[in-house]
């Protein structure tokens, strides 16, 4: 991104709020807070599907139908160095380690009503970052989503809340249809929801 931005010095806006986008004169008009409207040949909306849809002032029926098929859940991610959130047997450690209380056939995601976000109700996932990122084993590093018990406080490096895509039947059915809207009338879509997360 930095290399591309270096060639666009006069056209790069960091930490800028976009109010909306709309198609106009074969391109895309972007309404930028504090700057008004600026016309572009094409625009990449690198955001969640629901956020992208909210930005498109003149969304087509296909855009509304496809983008609204994707739901998101809020997860707590904790970056830490506490091995107690990994499997007890070291031989069972993998790059991705999960714990779940649900029984076979039970859903792993609960929706807290139409006004609330979907949240993971019983799934705890720990990424072994040392292995995933080829970090020196002397510096153990893990990222745990929705920890059932928090890591020891002195071993926590940061806590973050993220919205992750929920790959339910509706979302998976919508993914192959992205080609119907990708690049149409100057708008492109990018994000974890367009692929495997």
Where do the protein language model's features map onto the residues?
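Mid-domain catalytic core of redox enzymes
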Residues: 19-163
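C-terminal catalytic lobe of FAD-dependent flavoproteins
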Residues: 149-197
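A conserved beta-strand/loop element that lines the FAD pocket in flavoprotein oxidoreductases
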Residues: 7-19
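A structural signal for the hydrophobic beta-strands that form the central parallel beta-sheet
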Residues: 12-14, 45, 189
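Alpha-helix termination/capping residues and helix-transition junctions
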Residues: 5-6, 37
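Active-site phosphate/pyrophosphate- and oxyanion-stabilizing loops and adjacent acidic/basic residues
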Residues: 2
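Conserved beta-strand termini and adjacent loop/short-helix elements that scaffold enzyme active sites
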Residues: 15-17, 33, 190
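Short, well-ordered alpha-helix to beta-strand connector turns
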Residues: 8-9, 40-41, 184
């Amino acid at each position: 991104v930095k290399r591309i931005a270096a060639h666009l010095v006069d056209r790069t806006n960091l930490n800028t709020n976009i109010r909306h986008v709309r198609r106009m004169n074969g391109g895309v008009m972007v309404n930028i807070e504090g700057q008004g409207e600026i016309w572009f040949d094409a625009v990449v909306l690198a955001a969640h599907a629901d956020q992208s849809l909210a930005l498109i002032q003149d969304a087509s029926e296909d855009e509304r139908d496809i983008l609204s098929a994707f739901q998101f859940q809020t997860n707590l991610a904790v970056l830490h160095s506490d091995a107690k959130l990994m499997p007890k047997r070291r031989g069972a450690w993998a790059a991705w380690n999960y714990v779940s209380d649900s029984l076979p056939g039970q859903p792993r995601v609960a929706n807290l009503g139409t006004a609330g976000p979907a949240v993971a109700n019983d799934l705890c996932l720990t990424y072994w970052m040392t292995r995933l990122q080829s970090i020196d084993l002397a510096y153990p590093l893990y990222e745990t989503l929705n920890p059932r018990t928090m890591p020891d406080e002195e071993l926590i490096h940061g806590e973050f809340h993220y919205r992750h895509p929920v790959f339910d039947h509706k979302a998976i059915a919508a993914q192959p249809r992205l080609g119907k809207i990708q690049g149409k009338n100057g708008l492109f879509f990018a994000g974890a929801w367009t692929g495997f997360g």
